[in-house]
């Protein structure tokens, strides 16, 4: 099982991810796209890196707005896996915006 990060580690990591914010025991990114199709295209691009990492985000889509939430459920909070995948998602989101 992945090890939970301390508050100090979380604050350090989130500082390097300006697109993300800490919400309780999760990190979250909200991104708006041109339209619904662009939002869905972006979400589809997340499948491969999530599968490769063995770590899957919670995703909510509302027309052109995508909300991505990461936490490590089996650890009960935030782990390095969350921040590693958040970094990849941030890089992909810059291509699609």
UniProtKB/Swiss-Prot annotation:
Primary enzyme class: lyase
Reactions performed catalytically: (4aS,6R)-4a-hydroxy-L-erythro-5,6,7,8-tetrahydrobiopterin = (6R)-L-erythro-6,7-dihydrobiopterin + H2O
Enzyme Commission designation: 4.2.1.96
InterPro entries named in the record: PCD_sf, Pterin_deHydtase
UniProt xrefs under CDD domains: PCD_DCoH
One MF annotation (Gene Ontology) recorded for this entry: 4-alpha-hydroxytetrahydrobiopterin dehydratase activity
Disulfide bond entries: none
One of the GO BP terms on file: tetrahydrobiopterin biosynthetic process
Key words of the record: Lyase
Homology family: Belongs to the pterin-4-alpha-carbinolamine dehydratase family.
Entries under PANTHER family matching the protein: PTERIN-4-ALPHA-CARBINOLAMINE DEHYDRATASE
Descriptive protein name: Putative pterin-4-alpha-carbinolamine dehydratase
Organism, scientific name: Cyanothece sp. (strain PCC 7425 / ATCC 29141)
């Amino acid at each position: 099982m992945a090890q939970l990060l301390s508050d100090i580690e979380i604050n350090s990591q989130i500082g390097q991810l300006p697109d993300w914010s800490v919400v309780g025991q999760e990190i979250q990114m909200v991104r708006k796209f041109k339209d619904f199709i662009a939002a869905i295209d972006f979400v589809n691009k997340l499948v491969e890196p999530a599968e490769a990492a063995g770590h899957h985000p919670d995703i909510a889509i509302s027309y052109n707005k995508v909300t991505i939430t990461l936490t490590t459920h089996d650890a009960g909070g935030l782990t390095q896996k969350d921040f590693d995948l958040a970094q990849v998602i941030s890089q992909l989101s810059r291509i699609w915006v």
